[in-house]
Structures are given as structure tokens and as C-alpha cells.
Amino acid sequence: MSRFIFVTGGVVSSLGKGITSASLATLLEARGLNVTLIKMDPYINVDPGTMSPYQHGEVFVTEDGAETDLDLGHYERFIRTRLNRRNSFTTGRVYQHVLDKERRGEYLGATVQVIPHITDEIKLKIREGAGDADVAIVEIGGTAGDIESLPFLEAARQMRVELGSSQSLLVHLTLVPYIATAGEIKTKPTQHSVKELRSIGLQPDILVCRADDPIPQSAREKIALFTNVEARAVISSPDCKTIYQVPRGMHEQGLDAIVVEKFGLDLPEPDLGEWDRVVEAQLNPEHEVTVGMVGKYIELVDAYKSLNEALIHAGISNRAKVNILYLDAEDIERDGTGVLESLDAILVPGGFGDRGTEGKIAAIRYARENKVPYLGICLGMQLAVIEYARHVAGIEKAHSSELNPNTPDPVVGLITEWITEDGQKELRSADSDLGGTMRLGGQECVLEADSRAAECYGSTHIVERHRHRYEVNNNYLPQLEAAGLKIVGRSADGELVEVIEVGDHPWFVACQFHPEFTSTPRDGHGLFKGYVAAALAEQKAHKET
């Protein structure tokens, strides 16, 4: 039977519940437990798949094709377990399932209400998400006091009663602000946040207090006194140089020891050697490179969260600090490519819509013609094909039917059908719903043995995660390949282009999938490690000339 740890937040949002949950999971996993994590989001959207990155940040895709909150990316980067669609759900998903059951008559004519029907559905999904894990850490989105979060908090309260104190814990994350004019930190917001939880029947077992600097013992004791929490269970969580320091910091304060004790478990101390090596490599780089990321959501770096982390991981593997220069594609479209001249490498990430398209294509052309290492991801591959078609293959009006439905040469077009992993045929048209209708999740890819991609992966057969509706149009492949474009990766059935390379270039690789979703700080990812290594080589060659 699984044990459950509920994680809530108070005072303000964006305190780091996801990092806290992932760090605790890391510590428990290092003690030998099978740990999983669940994220519950209180918005009405069924999933974040159709939400703007400006609203929600990155959409993280799981191996089984679920479009989820970016916190699941944190979870997978911190623990060894791969998550699935049961590890993330929203208010919208819960209500959708309850209403479907009502339509089918499963409630036998009862009046369907928030309590018990919505809360029962939430509890069911929590237990399904836990599966056979020893411990399930359940992060409740939002902030204590939000109306939207109340059904989730009520479900957590009920589960705590059902499970008992030896099978469930509540960790509450709060803010302890420093008031410069007073010259002191203030504990009152934390006290009121806990008071809010207690008013609905939830008493925290552990408080994790976020602050700029370590919280003095006297302040922790004061918080403990007024929140009915043990002083040792008031954990100080100051800002760190890197998020990968958080597990070690929490272990040193005894967070995992408190959890293990309260659950009545006898477990060995965690071995955090891998994490110490990650932190040491990240904070003590021997080299430094600058990567230009040409995108359209650069005002919000969380829109590229997994990508940012994957570059950091590749830097760790190469003992290099990777500086990311975020470049607005529309600026390049308007002002030209001069801003690219100081870069060691260029990257065009995924995205949707035509805004900034020509700026991205200009950046890709600059990378190709000036032999600058280039990595294209999803749309970044499609635009690389369009750029090559226009300027090398002589298809001057080449475009994507997504970005220009009237193009006479759609070298990138809508995928109208494909075969899923379970052998089912998926059919799509331009009129299909936007939500949940893409080619999603892990898909097999076969690489050419002599390709750079195969060299990076160390294999010719890989599985990577996808999130797209459009693909390279196979009708144009003969013309593109005749002009020198190398198709080095295809889907398992050979029908879809997955990876391209440019032969007469030191490192020009673009892929239809999202390799950033499977990169981790302890292992990195072959494609990103190869990319950063190429950037270092480019930098060295540039200095020598």
C-alpha cells in the first residue's frame, strides 16, 4: 500500500513546490524507495496542451503522450522513474470524467455534487497515479486560500483521515520575506497561511520556508510555536546557485529523515554522490560557450524550460558553462543577422504559428552558410528543411502549409495519418480539434549508422517524444536529397522524416522530436552533449583563426 505526501503552497505562487517535491522524491529514492509524483492543477482546461506558453510555460510531454504541466519535467529530471498521463490531471479533466459518468448513468440518478462526486474522483485519480509506488508525492497546484484549489484540498483532507498519520503527510511550502526597511524577516505570512489550511481541516506536518537567505533558528522556533509544527520540521529553503543543490540542502536539515521516521520506516542513509558531482561540475566549469536560441516566446524563459535544462546538462557533461542568449525571431526578421555573429552555436526550438518565421529561417541560413553549429527541434527542423529547399534545392516558394496554407510548394504538410504504438491508425485533417490531436509521446526512430545523430546516441534505434501535427512532405524528398540534404532518421515504418543533417557542415542536425524531454542532469542527453561539444570546437577554431 502506497504512502502519500501532499505538498501545498501558501502566501504567493511560484515558490518552487515542484522543485521541493522533486527534491524530496530524490532523497527518498536514494534511500531505496520506489517513488512517484503526481501534479494536480486547479484550472478548468482539460490539459495545458492548448494553453499559450505565456500563460503556462512549457507543455511537458510524457512517454505515453500526455501533455502536462512543466513540473513533470522537474520530476523526471530528479528521479529515475518515467511518469505517465496518470501523474498529471486538472480540474477540467476531473469534471470531464464525472460528467461522462453522469451521462452514462453511473451515479444511479443521484444529484452530482462537488462533495462527494468530484472529491471521490480526485481521490480515485490520486490512487491510480500512485500505482504500486512505495511513496506518492502529490503536489496540489495553486495557493492556500484559492477558491479553485478547494476540491483538491478537501480530497487531501479526506485521504489523510482515511490513511492515518502513519500513511500520509502534509508538507506546506511558504514564503518568509525579508523586509529591508525593518531589517528583519517576517513570519506572519507563514502563520496566516497555515491558519488558512487549518480552517479547512489540514494541519501541516512539515513546513518548507522559502527565503532569500537561510532562516535563523529563532525564527524557525517562532514559526513552529504558532503553527503547531515541530521546530525540527520547519525547514529553511534559501535561494541556491543551482536547483540541483536543493536535495543536499534539504537532506542536511533532516527533511527525509523526518519523513522516514513519521512513516515508521527503517532505511539506509541516501547516497547523494551523483548529485554532488553534478553540482560540482556545474559550479566549476572549465569552458564557456554562448548559444543563441532564436524563438518567439523569449520573454518567458519557462516556455523553454526543458530545453534550458538540457543545455545546462550538456554543459555539465562537457565541463562548460552554457550561456543562453534569447533572441526574438522578429528582431532578426527586421534587423538582420548581425546579432548572430558572436555566437558559438545557434538553436531554433519548437513552436506554433507564423510569427517570426522568416527571422528563424534567416538564422538557420546564417548557421548553415557560416558553418556555425546548429540544432533544430520540431519546428526548428521543419524550417531548416524549408530554408534548404529555398536556398539550395531551388524551390523558391517552399513553405509549410501550417504557416502558409496557400503555398504552391508545401515541403512541410499536415500529417493525415500515422500508426500509433499499439497499431491503431490515427487520422487527422485541417479541421480536427487542436486539443489532444497531435502526434504525441514516444515514437521509434531509425538512424543511419554513419550519421552524427547515431554517433551522439551511440545507437541506430532510439525512442524520442513528439508533439507535432506537421511533417516533411515526402513528395519533395528526391529533390531535397539530390541537392545534398541528408535524411538520417526516419520513423519505424520509414514514412516520416525524423532527423536531417547537412553534410558539408561541421555540425548541423535537426530533429522532429523533442530530445530535451529525456535529458537529465546526471546523464545528460547525447544530442545536446554533441551539440555543446561542437560549439566548444567552433569556439576553439574561431580563436585559432
From Swiss-Prot:
It catalyses: UTP + L-glutamine + ATP + H2O = CTP + L-glutamate + ADP + phosphate + 2 H(+); L-glutamine + H2O = L-glutamate + NH4(+); UTP + NH4(+) + ATP = CTP + ADP + phosphate + 2 H(+). It is an enzyme of class 6 (ligase). UTP binds at residues 13, 186-191, 222. Keywords: ATP-binding, Glutamine amidotransferase, Ligase, Magnesium, Metal-binding, Nucleotide-binding, Pyrimidine biosynthesis. Disulfide bonds: none annotated. One of its GO terms (cellular component) is cytosol. GO terms for biological process: 'de novo' CTP biosynthetic process; pyrimidine nucleobase biosynthetic process. Mg(2+) binds at residues 71, 139. Pfam families: CTP_synth_N, GATase. Residues 1-265 are annotated as: Amidoligase domain. Pathway: Pyrimidine metabolism; CTP biosynthesis via de novo pathway; CTP from UDP: step 2/2. Gene3D superfamilies: 3.40.50.880, P-loop containing nucleotide triphosphate hydrolases. L-glutamine binds at residues 54, 351, 379-382, 402, 469. GO terms for molecular function: ATP binding; CTP synthase activity; glutaminase activity; identical protein binding; metal ion binding. CTPSs have evolved a hybrid strategy for distinguishing between UTP and CTP. The overlapping regions of the product feedback inhibitory and substrate sites recognize a common feature in both compounds, the triphosphate moiety. To differentiate isosteric substrate and product pyrimidine rings, an additional pocket far from the expected kinase/ligase catalytic site, specifically recognizes the cytosine and ribose portions of the product inhibitor. Homotetramer. Catalyzes the ATP-dependent amination of UTP to CTP with either L-glutamine or ammonia as the source of nitrogen. Regulates intracellular CTP levels through interactions with the four ribonucleotide triphosphates. This is CTP synthase.
